[in-house]
Amino acid sequence: MFDSMSLHMRRPALAARALCLLLVAALSTSVPATASSSSAAVPGTTCTVFPSDNVWNTDISKLPVNRLSDAWMRSMHSGSTDLHPDFGPPSYGMPFTVTDASTAKHRVKFQYASESDKGPYPFGPKTPIEGGQNAGGDRHAMMVDRSTCTLYELYHAYWNGGNPKAGSGAVYDLTANHLRPNGWTSADAAGLPIFPGLIRYDEVRAGFIGHAIRFTADNTRDQHIWPARHDASDLTASRYPPMGARFRLKAGFSLSGFSRDARVILTAMKHYGLILADNGSDWYFQGTRDSRWKNSLLDQLKRVPASAFQAVDESACMVSANSAQASCPS
């Protein structure tokens, strides 16, 4: 360690240099390194996840607080609940796979065919399934075709001995700001894509997450707001949050004491926030399945109280009701 006083007495130039080094070191312990100002490409591809002006990729840190924020927060038990990272090493988290033009595509039989994209889908007997091949539950499957930058998502997916079936399915052009038809589900209850809202290990290690994060609530309203396209509830009271509601970690929440990787995630929650996308446990947020996730990181994130969040009003960011393009007022 430098003794800055003695250096100042003996060598003024070295003292100045030492001070700079100390300042840099101090900053590096409090602010996550930002490797980029835009979201990273999907590993194994050159595909970014939607254009930079997509609502998922929009900074909402300056937006006004939603007038229903307090009511929504109470309905989500924010006074007695902490964040819960719903991902980790196998079998936790959402798996995805990268495909290309040579990957065989198949037609899938859908339970909700009228609200599903016909495909075909690059889905096969070895495609990773949420929870594992023998799992129950939602059984999401996600595939990114690197040759066309197309995202394919399935809900309740089964290979079924070569006759694949699923509850629903959706296909997304990752280079465009398209939304699904209003009223359509997807592989998620909100009618939104899942993959853009997942925390990925590669993003955290690169030092920057430039998108909103998917999360769930136990009780949601029978309503959806932009950019969501679908809802799944029979609760009518306005105290319940609708699908598509966006929340952010309050700017004043201190990141002191959190590890570098935890600060990367929490900084994203301050700037890009969380989007309510499905019914589930209150304040569970999602990431990819990855053996490199450390329990020490996940445990830190569980220390964040839900009361440190607030809902925002992003209605002014909407360019068109039928587009995911966003332009928020500065």
Write out the residue ranges for each language-model feature.
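Secretory targeting and sorting signals
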Residues: F2-S37
